[in-house]
Amino acid sequence: MTEPATATHETYRATVAWDGDREDLRAHTITLAEQRLAASSAPKRGGDPAKADPEQLLVAAASACHMLWFLDFARRERLRVVSYEDQAEGVLDGHHFVRIVLRPAIEFEDDPKPELLAQFHQRANEACFIANSLNFPVQVEGR
């Protein structure tokens, strides 16, 4: 049973489905909004490297959340971002993540001060719901 939404609660949904394929017990689909994503377990655990795995999705969620907050802070300061690409990496030690490292490469129309960018990254990390929910650090390294 799901908790009813309140002013402080929001509910997010994903559908994960396995079609009963006895040949590939790891293959499944994830439906988010209207998009279906072919997924599997991580390649180290016998999964298909051509498909997304839960570990990658966790890293992508942290990266996307950080990026969206960063872009919002830049917009508020009227800084025009031309492009943003993050080569994020999650580090798994045994059976748990120990950190996620974000390495965003960001191109601006003008050259903002490095101190302002550092402030945006710190604020994005503090504002990101995903990072706030993890029990390990999300670090940012510039590229």
What name fits each language-model region?
Residues 1-60, 68-143:
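Extended beta-strand/beta-hairpin segments
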